[in-house]
Design a protein with these regions (language model features):
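S-adenosylmethionine
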Residues: 1-258
């Protein structure tokens, strides 16, 4: 942990070494390792540039991802795979989706400004906070004025571009962000499917908070006869195969655990 903090650079080298060694000395289980910890940290500080240069040659260390993951990204995005992997190692910003039925992004930005919360518009309905906030402290969240949703994720509903009275299927809908975005964008009719009954309840909670309605069913989209009424859909939103590759900045263990 101390070495990670050294790399991060938020504290002075002296402070990190001193506090880490003192913490080891004050714990009966680690007191005997205090000298070793001190030696390792000081050597790292002396040789950090050489160590970093060696580690940067190993792609799995450089991008904090297994080689199979790196190969897959490289095959899918041959022209910018390094940038994609690099961004995956950074902390994700907090981005909000403004509920177009309740307020405009410009008006919401003014409200944030009045509260002393720095933010920037980064998409049609996307507002990025300069610093993350607990959900309970986000102005308008509880009232359904905004939702937390990455800017990239918001593109799904925008590209689908729902129209008035269209019948739309969201085939893998939990926790309901994309379903809600469709309904905020147009007076359409959405059928939201989720195979997990508990996650289907999350969709209902999301829609209730935002003041929009959809037909929510706990069902397997592949078992069409069990849920489909026979009415044709004008559009289908399918977020599959649900690899979680888009959330590695928030859950860095994803490449290692899947």
């Amino acid at each position: 942990i101390a070495i990670a903090l050294v790399v991060e650079g938020r504290y002075s080298d002296f402070t990190l070494v001193n506090e880490t060694v003192n913490a080891a000395r004050n714990n009966r289980r680690t007191v005997r390792f205090a000298g070793l910890i001190n030696a390792v940290l000081r050597r790292f500080l002396r040789e950090r540039e050489q160590i970093s240069a060696v580690l940067q040659k190993d792609l799995d260390v450089r991008f904090n991802a297994p080689l199979w993951w790196i190969r897959r990204i490289k095959e899918s995005h041959p022209s910018n795979w390094e940038e994609i992997l690099r961004i995956g190692t950074l902390r994700a910003p907090m981005t909000l989706r403004v509920n177009a039925r309740r307020i405009t992004p410009a008006a919401y930005l003014e409200e944030l400004k009045a509260r002393g919360i720095p933010a920037l518009r980064v998409g049609r309905s996307a507002v990025m906070l300069e610093s993350p906030l607990p959900v309970k402290d986000i102005p308008g969240f509880t009232e359904g004025i905004v939702s937390v949703q990455d800017a990239g994720t918001q593109l799904a509903a925008e590209i689908l571009a729902p129209q008035k009275n269209e019948q739309i299927l969201d085939a893998c809908a939990a926790p309901g962000g994309k379903t809600a975005h469709l309904l905020e964008s147009a007076d359409c009719h959405v059928t939201a499917l989720e195979i997990d009954p508990k996650r289907a309840e999350l969709i209902k909670s999301t829609l209730l908070r935002l003041g929009v309605e959809a037909t929510v069913r706990a069902a397997d989209a592949a078992m069409v006869s069990e849920w489909h009424s026979g009415r044709e859909f004008d559009a289908i939103l399918l977020d599959a195969p649900c690899t979680a590759s888009g959330i590695v900045r928030r859950q860095p263990d994803v490449p290692w655990s899947r």
